[in-house]
Amino acid sequence: MMFFWIFWSILMSLSLGVIHGTGTSLLNPEGEKISDPFSWLNKELIYIIGYMMIVRYLFQKIPILNIRSLLLTPLKKSKIIRYAMHQTIFSIFNWIAFFYLIPFSIMLNLDPDTGDFNSSNLLIWNLSIILIVYFTNFLNILLNKKDNLVVIFGVVLTLIKILEYNNLLDISVYSESIFYSLYETPILIIVPLSSLIFIYYYVFNFFFFN
């Protein structure tokens, strides 16, 4: 059953990457195409990452129990913690980002209307998003058993989306500006990279000293 869901997640990610990369709306495939799929995705990324954090919290297996049980063995403490942390790297919640972004970027470049992208900048943008995804991976470990905090986050995110739908608030403008800057100014990849390095060692020290 687990392999079915993994296969389904990969297939859906690939399909959505192709669909969104061509500017087609999944809700209205026969309707008018999205004129600028790249800008559209940058606007929605703040919500996508937020909702994925909630889904990850609900379904991703956290290696805390593995760490605690292994700490009772003669194995070196640092190796145990790194082993458990590195297990999460291969989570399907991380890989679906690859399976979505790769076809999305390919379709962007193939489309004559939207294909005027700097390939190296687009690659850096992809890597930046992947780094952010892995940041949420390790953040999820810290959020273990903090149900109230995650519920509050989910409620706030939903309320913001409702306000945006009713034209009372629009944070997608800021989302587009932030994520587009990762394409426009490639050196900014240092921000998600340094954030990932920081949270990796923060999580490591959290378990090592506690």
Which stretches of residues belong to each language-model region?
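Hydrophobic alpha-helical transmembrane segments of membrane proteins
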Residues: 1-67, 77-210
